[in-house]
From Swiss-Prot:
Its main location: cytoplasm. This is 1-(5-phosphoribosyl)-5-[(5-phosphoribosylamino)methylideneamino] imidazole-4-carboxamide isomerase. Belongs to the HisA/HisF family. GO terms for cellular component: cytoplasm. GO terms for molecular function: 1-(5-phosphoribosyl)-5-[(5-phosphoribosylamino)methylideneamino]imidazole-4-carboxamide isomerase activity; phosphoribosylanthranilate isomerase activity. GO terms for biological process: L-histidine biosynthetic process; L-tryptophan biosynthetic process. It catalyses: 1-(5-phospho-beta-D-ribosyl)-5-[(5-phospho-beta-D-ribosylamino)methylideneamino]imidazole-4-carboxamide = 5-[(5-phospho-1-deoxy-D-ribulos-1-ylimino)methylamino]-1-(5-phospho-beta-D-ribosyl)imidazole-4-carboxamide. The lineage of its organism: Bacteria, Bacillati, Actinomycetota, Actinomycetes, Frankiales. CDD domains: HisA (cd04732). PANTHER family: 1-(5-PHOSPHORIBOSYL)-5-[(5-PHOSPHORIBOSYLAMINO)METHYLIDENEAMINO] IMIDAZOLE-4-CARBOXAMIDE ISOMERASE. It comes from the Bacteria. Keywords: Amino-acid biosynthesis, Cytoplasm, Histidine biosynthesis, Isomerase.
Length: 245
């Protein structure tokens, strides 16, 4: 077994121009945490190397925060992973044009696999695919619809050359009930591509458990940070000393 460093991605979810957190990804469950740019700059100041930035309005198909999102990306000096509503060439190009280091494709990977294949061919590892899961069923369209069987889609995306997956247990997202480590192990058992974990982190011990899963390179942390369960410096300290196995 070897020591590994888990990359932490503090989340900034944007709805109607505000930084918010949802419970189980449901529209209408938002808790507001103020200005998205201020939140992103706080995470940068606290030591983040990545920020997970989500346009929830675009994800739910109810508009977008494109100008604000672009301002956040421009204003920080850390890498940004951008997600929400990226479903065609125009939205992909707009997301990449913000300067985001990486973009997450979700629904489109389920609904338009041919386009995703072409997008991966075109921009390579700047694309990660978000696999949002209930049990082993994928959730689409802002988590409001079923989108196919996890392992079938994963096999297809591996064959298409997808470089990275962001795996979210929808039932645990925003709930502070702990991550689904079994789900992460089941995914990393069938793909050699790196995985970023998302959903349910509530304590520093959860990050240690995630970091111990071989094949998981990062974890998105949202509500636990906003709710004060721990600080980002505390999280960075524990995830730089974990042994994988």
């Amino acid at each position: 077994m070897a020591g590994v460093t888990l990359t932490l991605l503090p989340a900034v979810d944007v709805a109607d121009g505000r930084a918010v957190r949802l419970v189980q990804g449901e529209a209408g469950s938002e808790t507001s945490y103020g200005d998205p740019l201020e939140a992103a700059l706080t995470w940068q100041r606290d030591g983040a190397e990545w920020i997970h930035l989500v346009d929830l309005d675009a994800a739910f198909g109810r508009g977008s925060n494109r100008e604000l999102i672009a301002e956040v990306v421009r204003s920080v000096d850390v890498a940004v992973e951008l997600s929400g509503g990226i479903r065609d060439d125009d939205s992909l190009d707009a997301a990449l044009a913000t300067g985001a280091a990486r973009v997450n494709i979700g629904t489109a990977a389920l609904e338009d696999p041919d386009w995703v294949r072409r997008a991966i061919d075109r921009v390579g590892d700047r694309i990660a695919v978000g696999l949002d899961v209930r049990g082993t069923t994928l959730a689409a369209r802002g988590w409001t619809q079923d989108g196919g069987e996890l392992f079938e889609v994963l096999a297809r995306l591996d064959a298409d050359g997808c470089a990275r997956y962001v795996v979210t247990d929808v039932r645990r997202d925003g709930t502070l009930t702990g991550p689904n480590v079994e789900l992460l192990r089941s995914v990393t058992a069938v793909t050699d591509r790196p995985v970023v974990a998302s959903g349910g982190v509530s304590a520093l011990a959860d990050l240690v458990a995630i970091a111990a899963v071989p094949g998981v390179e990062g974890a998105i942390v949202g509500k636990a940070l906003y709710a004060g369960a721990f600080t980002l410096p505390e999280a960075l300290a524990v995830t730089s000393t974990v042994v994988a196995g």
